[in-house]
């Protein structure tokens, strides 16, 4: 029996040490969770409803690109004439925004083609309503090039460009 007592003692000390270690880990984990709260979700108003971006040829090496126009759900908008220009605040009328939303959804279903020369810039219209499953991202590669495209693709690209210009031209500076 005398030999069993030291084994029980060592086992008891191991259990006690393990219990202290586990208690410390649990307490520490709770402390970390309280110290780093989950980031707050981005408010819907902070995400632009429409973002229009025109990237020139050779854009891959540039770091100064900005959206040409960002439109919020309430019609508030920010426009930049080019990547070096200061942003201008203003609005876009609600009727233009509504028509643009319908046209973006229609354009999502068409083929705008990709020319063989695809390194000649890119135009993008991002439509991001509050329901993320309704997002539409339209991209036209080499918007000035039409070689190798079908007539339907050319017509779809013209509709895209017309919408892009309509939104830019509807901007009213504050």
Feature map (PLM): residue ranges:
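A short, structured loop/turn motif at beta-sheet edges
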Residues: 73, 94-97, 127-134
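Extracytoplasmic low-complexity, Pro/Thr/Ser/Ala/Gly-rich segments
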Residues: 36-95, 174
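Extracytoplasmic/periplasmic, Sec-exported soluble proteins
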Residues: 63, 88-96, 117, 152-159
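Charged, amphipathic alpha-helical segments
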Residues: 95-114
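Secretory targeting and sorting signals
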Residues: 1-37
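Short, well-ordered, aromatic-rich surface patches in folded extracellular/luminal domains
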Residues: 2-3, 31-32, 36-57, 110-174
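Residue-level marker of positions within ordered structural domains that often coincide
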Residues: 76, 105, 130
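Short, structured motif recognition centered on aromatic/hydrophobic residues
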Residues: 71, 100, 104, 125
